[in-house]
Each structure stands twice: as C-alpha cells, then as structure tokens.
Amino acid sequence: MIVVQVSDTHIKSKGKLAYNKVDIHKALYNCILHINNLKPKPDLVIFTGDITDNGTNEEYKLFKETVKLLDVPFYVIPGNHDNAENLKREFEEYDWFEENNHLSLVIEDFPIRIIGLDSSIKGKSYGGLSEERLLWLEKQLNKFPDKKVLLFIHHPPVKIGIEHMDVQNLQIGRERLADLLGKYEQVLALACGHVHRVSTTLWNKIIVLTAASPSHQVALDLRKDAKAEFVMEPPSVQLHYWTEEQGLTTHTSYIGKFEGPYPFYNEKGELID
C-alpha cells in the first residue's frame, strides 16, 4: 500500500504569490502531475494541513480545482492557516468528517487504517488536542486493535530544533497523546506537516515523521537566534509504503526534472566503471 502525504500547500487568492516570491499555485499543479506520474500508482493522497494560507472560500475553491486532477482518491485535514468552517463547507460533498466539533477522519477501505487527527485551534499558530479529540482517537483505536494504523496530524508533538517552528508545535494535549499512543501498538507512525521540512524523531517509542512542502521550505538553521526564513529547496512529497511482510517504509519523493535515470550495469550485466 502506498500513501502519499502532501503538506502545507498554502494556496492563496488567484494570482497571489506567497511572501511576494513563491508561486504556490504552480507548485500545487506540479505536485499533482508528479503524483499522477508515480509508478506504481498510490492508493490515496492525504493533505496534512495548511491547505490554504488564509482559509478563504476562494482559496479552497482554487485548491479543489487543482486537486481534482488527481488520478487517485484524496483527503484533507486542517492546519493552523486553515478555516475549519470554510474547509468543511467547501468539501462537504466528500463526506470525510464524522464529527461536528473537529475535522478528523478515518479511512477504512485499505489494508491499513488511515486516521487524520485535527490539531488546529482557531486563531492560533500552535496546535492542540482537546479531551474530546483525544477520546475520539481512543475510540477509533479501540475499534480494530489488530489492524495497523498510520496516523496523520498537522502539528508535530516534538521539537525539531528550529526555534521559531518549535514554539508553535503541538502545545496542548501532547503528554496525553503520548500516553494514549503508548497503549496501542498498532500505530505504525505519526506523520505530521507544519514545519516544511523532512525529519524523523523517536518520541516515547513512537516514530514521528514530518513532511516538507511542495512549494517552499523552512530554512534549516538550528541556532537559538535563527531568523524565521524560508528557502527554495527542492519541493517534495512523502511516500509511505507499507507491506505486510516488512511494515512501514517512508520515502521522500522530489518534485521536478532531474538528470537520469542512468543504468548501473551495461548490456552484459557488468557494473559500469
């Protein structure tokens, strides 16, 4: 099974560049083309928050126009830049969300279960999990204790060493989430967005993964006084590849035209020297 994770598309109003620099509309289009050209074809795509930059209806409509080009099913959960009411209204036809007070979802139609957990708090850049959301998650994990789960959330519960991002990670319900996940061994990993960088952290025996953006990336600067800056490093998506024999492997798939592929071996089967 292949799950593509896309995070932090930050779609703005038509013709608007992010930070007067980044053509996020073109970036999303290129991302969709990239996913459609993947071999083998993924089973689904999940967008892990910050779908839009300001949460307006116009931005969600523009996002939807582009992602409808996908050849595979897609799902979304919100991030801190999103507006939950507008997001739910614009995607009401998809019937993803079963709760009224948060936009969390469960996908049951595959060899492993996909759970998307809403960590957004209206008006806040940091994330949080209320007791209601945590109880909902616990209920979902109790349903099929023998079936593996890949859990998605926007805000990572860990610090990645970039100060201006770490102060706006998952701030509320973090310890309760750690305790909860520690009880359920079927959770393969917690896959996050928000930080615009690929990272891996072992947190309370739980693998926490973060994804880069298909547009711009947060600058990698681990100094305590580092400025809040972005760089135009190669855009990418995450490919979460699961097999029953081995379990979960996650790849970073870069978007763009690169040299190659070139063969390692010649026509005689000899290593090219």
From Swiss-Prot:
Name it: Probable glycerophosphodiester phosphodiesterase GpdQ
| Organism the protein comes from | Arcobacter nitrofigilis (strain ATCC 33309 / DSM 7299 / CCUG 15893 / LMG 7604 / NCTC 12251 / CI) (Campylobacter nitrofigilis)
**Gene Ontology terms describing biological process:** glycerol metabolic process
GO-annotated molecular function: 3',5'-cyclic-AMP phosphodiesterase activity; glycerophosphodiester phosphodiesterase activity; metal ion binding
Record-stated family: Belongs to the cyclic nucleotide phosphodiesterase class-III family.
- Co-factor: note: Binds 2 Fe(2+) ions per subunit.
Detail which positions bind Fe cation 1.
8, 10, 50, 196
Cofactor(s) of this protein: Fe(2+)
UniProt key word Metal-binding: yes
Binding of Fe cation 2, residues: 50, 80, 154, 194
Q: What is the lineage of its organism?
A: Bacteria, Pseudomonadati, Campylobacterota, Epsilonproteobacteria, Campylobacterales
Which gene is annotated as encoding this protein in its UniProt record? gpdQ
Keywords attached to this Swiss-Prot or TrEMBL record, sorted alphabetically, are: Glycerol metabolism, Hydrolase, Iron, Metal-binding
- Give a short account of what the protein does: Catalyzes the hydrolysis of the 3'-5' phosphodiester bond of glycerophosphodiesters such as glycerophosphorylethanolamine (GPE), a typical phospholipid metabolite.
The UniProt catalytic activity note for this protein reads:
a sn-glycero-3-phosphodiester + H2O = an alcohol + sn-glycerol 3-phosphate + H(+); sn-glycero-3-phosphoethanolamine + H2O = ethanolamine + sn-glycerol 3-phosphate + H(+)
